[in-house]
């Protein structure tokens, strides 16, 4: 299996990003994944428009209607925002996904099980109109999907219809909207449709359910991976694409698909690389290829809506599957030595493997929340909040345990083996191996 990681950007590129410059340095001499130049001209124009959007309330596809404006402006409750599908996939992500999965791939229909505001189906329509020269009702009838929120479904139908009319001016927008109402269903994800479709299926955003812990959609993805799809794309929270609890899904993807592209994209602070942010992963997988397993991924790139092009042009370096440990890589070349030492070290022991007796233990208070603010101390905190946890540690390793917090050893372990969130006390206790 060939595994490639596109590592963190060089200093001059980071300066370009930090200064907000629009020019993109020439990285081809370093070896890059650059797909933009192969796009049809019309797709390039859409992409260029998409990456320049700095205000998510604006749309390259036309005017946002009053419903969308109310979703962005009025709700302050997180539950309400999620229920109204506040978090949408950026247009450039949708365009990349559609362009790659629809390349030389004949299908009956394209099905998006979580439509959002329609960005994927809009990008799909554009690519099909260019590559397969589809237009008018032949193009309209290709686009299918489902959505769990009525308001969001209404937005998607209006946005998709507006795009289709731009592609095929002979279409009448009212008639297109009525047809899309039949093809884009209001659906409860707990009752995911069993109907087999011979086209593309994409998880654009995880469906949200009040009170859930963020993984109610994992069985849906499991079902898609086991299906007879020739191609698919998963657009996931990066923590899920890299976390231990979803390793079984990654193993299935590796087993069932031969060529896999993963792009770690967008902005959300997470302690995976120092000073580098990310929000979502895009995993694109293709079956039935003669070529051996191939896995290509970006590093976690820092950018803003004005320079998303950086995500699609990045230096590359190779890692082996064993070094990635079957996890979509979060390991930079600089961390490989630590990675290998931690895996093979004979002088490390897990806390859960040690016998703890009351007379030979020390009380340690640790705080693992707050992004990079990892604290460990013997003294009981003056104010005990939910952020502080109490652990009993054997005497002879207590000082080493505290030192791991201070010297960055524990943080580096979490960057590689964690899932992008605050450190779980259970994971820490069960998995971290303290130096003897």
Regions found by a protein language model. Give the residues of each.
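Catalytic micro-motifs at enzyme active sites that drive phosphoryl/nucleotidyl and oxygen chemistry
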Residues: 99, 132-133, 172, 267-273, ...
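Polybasic, glycine- and aromatic-enriched phosphate-binding surface used to engage nucleic acids
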Residues: 303, 307-436
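Short, conserved SAM-binding/catalytic segment
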Residues: 157-170, 174-179
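A general structural motif
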Residues: 107, 138-141, 197-199, 229, ...
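Short hydrophobic beta-strand segments
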Residues: 108-112, 260, 361-368
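Class I S-adenosyl-L-methionine
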Residues: 2-159, 193, 206, 217, ...
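Signature of N6-adenine DNA methyltransferases within the class I
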Residues: 83, 88-93, 115-122, 148-157, ...
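Residues that flank catalytic or metal-binding motifs in active/ligand-binding sites
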Residues: 180, 279-281, 387, 428
